[in-house]
Amino acid sequence: MYCWHELYGTQWAEVEGFLVLRFRIDGSDHTGYMQPIGEGDFTTILPQIEADAAAQGEPLRLFGITSQGAELLQARYGESVALYTPRATADYLYRRSDLVALTGKHYQPKRNHINRFLSLYPDHHYQPLTTDRIEECIRLEEEWCRNRGGCHDEGVRAERRALMRAFEAFDALGLQGGMLYVGDQLVAFTFGSMLNDHTFDIHIEKADTRYEGVFAMINREFARTLPEEVVYLNREEDLGVEGLRKAKLSYHPAFLELKQRAVWLSERGRACRRLWQACFAEDKPSFVEEFLTGPYRESQMHTREVEGVTVAMAHLVPFEGEGRKIGYIYGVATLPDYRGRGLASSLVEEIVERCHREGYDAVALIAASESLQSFYRELGFEGEVPIYLHTPDGFDFGTGDVEGNKAMLRPLKDGITMPNHLVLNLLS
């Protein structure tokens, strides 16, 4: 929390004996809260937190929810809350004894990596990470950046700022770490802190990959130095990154600690859920909850009502990329009994007009069938441009086939020439 303060701006308060944490979601302007920490039923204080969120013009969004916490929420709020369990934020927990011994066939590749390291670098040694050695760690991290073309990615820069804050308050934060040398050259370091009486959390691990087996070696050596009362090592989440997931699974976790997220829904949000379930029956309920707890924004949902009932909707999702601001139209749906009345086309035109007023360069959408392609051509959309839609939480705005996603476009500015493909990032 302290180390990542610059990105998340985390604040805390005590409310009726519970610790409440408030932060910026993914470093954006949107506010989120962690599940309150304390003894008893935390849902009793949620009206106060909901009021705090409303004062900032936000719905209540809760993160880090345990399975027991989810049961309390469902019992108290029912359909007024959307709940989703993202695989990408699950923590990987390993038995410390497994990472020390590395016994069994499934750990043979790790033993091979370590044996290779021992064979190639007989002059290696390991020692605890102490504050007088921090400058060496910083130099290794800088070299790590240079080897990857520099720390230009915002995520990497944010991690570096967090690393520096950790080093500045290393002892005060109760951090413990280890350093691996070959000769007098630092080749890897790691550090973390105790989560509870029996679990140690690994915050960071950096290594010079020019040294074969270096990650396997620092992993084992640090696990060896932890006290016997440490039963589990928490190596945190994989963020949905395929390579990171593969690496974490290769150490055979004892279990994954799943964490749910929730958002409180207004009547419009509940109407979105009902309409989605009625019109897109092939989508699993979990997909709808993923959308509602993730990229869904009530202010970006356009609807049509008949006698007070929401019968049609379409969503504007803002993206940017290739030097352009693109309005992506998503989730266009009309209840079967109300189709053929021009509701969908009027919603699309309404969103196009909004995008024009708000300075978008173009509007894009993916037509799921040939008949829909014909429908959207009549509304001024054209072409089939390969499109890649990136979001912080990995939500799939396409068809499920990343390479097969083709977008139809409608330029909104004179002289705009659209590229032969689009790589777009979600705007917060």
Region locations from a protein language model:
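Conserved active-site alpha-helix within GNAT-family acetyltransferase domains
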Residues: 69-83, 239-256, 361, 369-394
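Conserved GNAT acetyl-CoA-binding A-motif
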Residues: 56-66, 228-236, 355-369
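A short, internal acetyl-CoA/4′-phosphopantetheine-binding micro-motif in the GNAT/acyltransferase core
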Residues: 33-41, 203-212, 329-340
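A conserved beta-strand-loop-helix scaffold within acyl/acetyltransferase catalytic domains
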Residues: 1-15, 124-208, 269-333
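C-terminal "cap" of GNAT-fold acetyltransferases
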Residues: 93-99, 108-111, 264-267, 368, ...
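Conserved acetyl-CoA-binding loop-helix of GNAT-fold acetyltransferases
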Residues: 41-51, 211-224, 334, 340-355
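Acyltransferase donor/substrate-recognition loop-hinge adjacent to the catalytic core
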Residues: 79-151
